[in-house]
Structures are given as C-alpha cells and as structure tokens.
Amino acid sequence: MACNIPNQRQRTLSTTGEALYEILGLHKGASNEEIKKTYRKLALKHHPDKNPDDPAATEKFKEINNAHAILTDISKRSIYDKYGSLGLYVAEQFGDENVNTYFMLSSWWAKALFVIVGLLTGCYFCCCLCCCCNCCCGHCRPESSVPEEDFYVSPEDLEEQIKSDMEKDVDFPVFLQPTNANEKTQLIKEGSRSYCTDS
C-alpha cells in the first residue's frame, strides 16, 4: 500500500519577514495607508467573484487577505517584522507576549548557559537538594532567628480554661430557640428588620 504524499512543497518558515510585503507589492516598513490602498486594489483584481473560472486567482486572493490581516494587526506586524513567519508560528503556539522569551531561550548563549550551570551543579543535583530536600532533609538548613517553643498544654489547664470561659459567658441565658424553617418559610420577614435580641 503506497502512501499518498502530495506533490505540493511544504512551506518553510522565514525569519526575514519580507514575503507578506512582496505579496502586496510593498517595501518593508510601508505605512498602514499604503497597505490598505494596495490591499483594496489587489483584492478587487483577484476577487473570486470577478474570476470565477480561475482557481489561481482564488489562491492569490487568500494570500492577499492573509497578508492584509497580519500587516494591519499591530502586534502581529511587529512580530513579523522582527522574526518573520517563524515568529508568527511561535506567537500562535505560545502567545504574542511569549515570542521574545522563546527566541531568547532558543539562542545559543541561553543553551550554553543551561549546559554550563548543569555541569557545575552535577546535572542540577545540588539544586535539587537545596530547593526540594532543604539540604539533606533539613539537617543542613540554616538556623532560624525565631526560637521554636514547645506548646504543651496539660489537660487539667485546658479544663480550667474552659470552665472559666463558660463562667464569664453565662450572663444572659437563651430563652427562645429559633423556629424550624421549611420551604414556605420566608427568610426575611416583611416589615422592619431588627437585629436586637430584646423584644
């Protein structure tokens, strides 16, 4: 069974950021007004309704629309101008705000720094010990400035404290218990609200 591989060449991602300008026939750095004018002219020329029998015109129209959509969006245009279509692909995958971070971390010096730090720390083993295990399960951790106190309360002391608290709070006994609520009971009575216990 043979695989059906299309003869169409897979489009490569550029890093120069000039192809969309070339589609519209503009120079890199063209103003928004120039982009709009050229887009209108080319869109009318290659519109599928004006060229119903020409599939190449339809494809050209799609390319023109895509170029216009990217070049009129300020953030996409700045990413495209700086990083090309590869930058747009990264923005689609990781978000517009993470494009600079992605290219910074994929640079040769960031990779070299990662390898050097990894070698110096024994494949990050000592970082693991310090951060995760607090250096040998806490045996090597620094002494804290606040001394730890043992809080042991004997049952007799706790019982005396509870009795003294109960004696202080026995000023006003409860005379009336709340009524049971059901589905027909209103949560708030009509009329004035009173938060006092005296009636």
Swiss-Prot record:
This protein's UniProt keywords: Chaperone, Lipoprotein, Membrane, Palmitate, Phosphoprotein
Gene that this sequence comes from: DNAJC5B
Entry-annotated residues carrying Phosphoserine: S14
Domain J: 19-84
One GO term describing the cellular component: cytoplasm
Topological relation to the membrane, as annotated: Lipid-anchor
Tissues and organs where the protein is expressed, per its UniProt entry: Testis specific.
Protein species of origin: Homo sapiens (Human)
SUPFAM superfamilies (alphabetical): Chaperone J-domain (SSF46565)
Cross-referenced CDD domains: DnaJ (cd06257)
Repeat recorded as keyword: no
Main location: membrane
Oligomeric form and interacting partners: Interacts with the chaperone complex consisting of HSC70 and SGTA.
Name by which UniProt lists this protein: DnaJ homolog subfamily C member 5B
